[in-house]
A protein has these predicted regions:
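Bacterial Sec-dependent signal peptides at the C-terminal "C-region" and cleavage site
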Residues: 3-23
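Small-residue packing motifs within transmembrane alpha-helices
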Residues: 2-3, 46
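Catalytic glycan-binding domains that act on GlcNAc-containing polysaccharides
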Residues: 19-164
């Protein structure tokens, strides 16, 4: 492989452009990387983005489970009233004066705040699979087969997000 480096020098006094060429032979084998050889780092933000895609396709106005009157999951992360109550309980334990209302589930910023409060309280050191499966299935969600299917959907979205 031959590498040609061509630096350009511009003199500010005469505004002349001069070219200086260097040739250097670099002997290195070309290494072909396979997808399994490349470690993809998935961030917490990637996880949240994937959850939003699975839950609502990014629709802040989404309403799911309409058959559960009064307990519908709504917003980008499909938050149920029980989750709002849980987040408010956590805030009370943390001696915070902040409280969320049901309508806050339609607000992307507040939805994300609620998610992180829940996650940091219950899943500070959990892996992404446990977080996703519990988000979908509740406190013991990681044990349910239905949440394993959910996790596969999240993984598929993560794969799409990390191929950039």
């Amino acid at each position: 492989m031959l590498l040609i480096v061509t630096p350009l020098f511009i003199s500010t006094q005469s505004l002349e452009v001069t070219e200086n060429c260097y040739e250097e032979r670099i002997e290195q084998p070309i290494v072909e990387l396979k997808p399994k050889d490349v470690q993809v780092v998935i961030s917490e933000q990637d996880l949240v983005s994937a959850l939003i895609l699975v839950e609502s396709r990014g629709n802040d106005s989404a309403i799911g489970d309409r058959h559960l009157v009064g307990e519908e999951a709504v917003g980008a992360l499909q938050i149920r009233p029980v989750m709002v109550r849980e987040v408010n309980r956590i805030l009370k334990i943390q001696k915070s004066d902040k409280r969320y209302k049901l309508k806050d589930r339609f607000d992307r910023e507040k939805t994300l705040e609620m998610f992180y409060i829940w996650k940091n309280y219950h899943h500070k050191d959990s892996d992404f699979e446990t977080i996703a499966r519990n988000w979908n299935g509740g406190p013991r969600g990681y044990k349910r087969n239905s949440t394993l299917r959910y996790w596969k959907k999240v993984q598929k979205e993560l794969d799409g997000l990390t191929v950039r």
